[in-house]
Swiss-Prot record:
It is an enzyme of class 4 (lyase). Belongs to the D-glutamate cyclase family. It comes from Corynebacterium urealyticum (strain ATCC 43042 / DSM 7109). SUPFAM superfamilies: PSTPO5379-like. Keywords: Lyase. The keyword Cell membrane does not apply. Signal peptide: none annotated. Its EC number is 4.2.1.-. It comes from the Bacteria. GO terms for molecular function: lyase activity. This is Putative hydro-lyase cu1581. The lineage of its organism: Bacteria, Bacillati, Actinomycetota, Actinomycetes, Mycobacteriales. InterPro entries: D-Glu_cyclase, Putative_hydro-lyase, UPF0317.
Amino acid sequence: MSTSTHEMSPAAARAAFREGVAVPTTGYSDGYAQANLMVLPKEYAFDFLLFAQRNPKPCPILGVLEPGQLNSELLPGGDIRTDIPKYRVYRDGELAGEYPDVTEFWRDDLVSFLIGCSFTFEGALLDNGIPVAHIEQGRNVPMYKTSIPTARAGRFHGPLVVSMRPIPASQIADAVRVTSRYPAVHGAPVHVGDPAAIGISDLASPDYGDAVEIPDGHIPVFWACGVTPQAAVMETKPSLAIAHAPGHMLVTDARDLQYQVP
């Protein structure tokens, strides 16, 4: 990825995505937080907010837009329908397609939830000398459905989804320490080591994103992931749901340090 995308302002990044750039957003706009998106009809909004409250590791809420609202302080002057590089649309729990914008599907009763994303703490990992494999390899982060259930809330339930980053064995404690300071963007890992222990049979076949090579001496480390709501949508089957395509996030105007705790 070019230096210019790392240095791009969030507004410039969103403008590029609005114009049709459709790439994963890891490494975009260094120093700014990124967010997952879940958009649901108002009739499902309370149940989903309760689901997020009961599952704060995969679903840390950064903001909620009013029904029909298109922007907020996280994307001032933006448009939630167009400012993400790629969207997914679900109907009755089935993936209907991926789209560069979702204006044609928009309704005034739709409530947008912005959910913390682990791309936000990748800069802190790099600043501490901890390598991030998918950035080094030019790939999307790999994500996997697990055998760990989420806490049910109203109509919403489903499996926990995790992202995976292979970390040098000698730096795992540092990775835990660094990411634990970002609870609003998934925080510390939920699992280290054997993927089979959480129901993942093959790291080379992620459910979302791209597989990455695991270098010698590296251990797979798993963080709760904001794609978990999409897995819940597949189980819950709301009439309509709109989300980001995995790895294609909303680049917000919030500084990543806003979500760092001492």
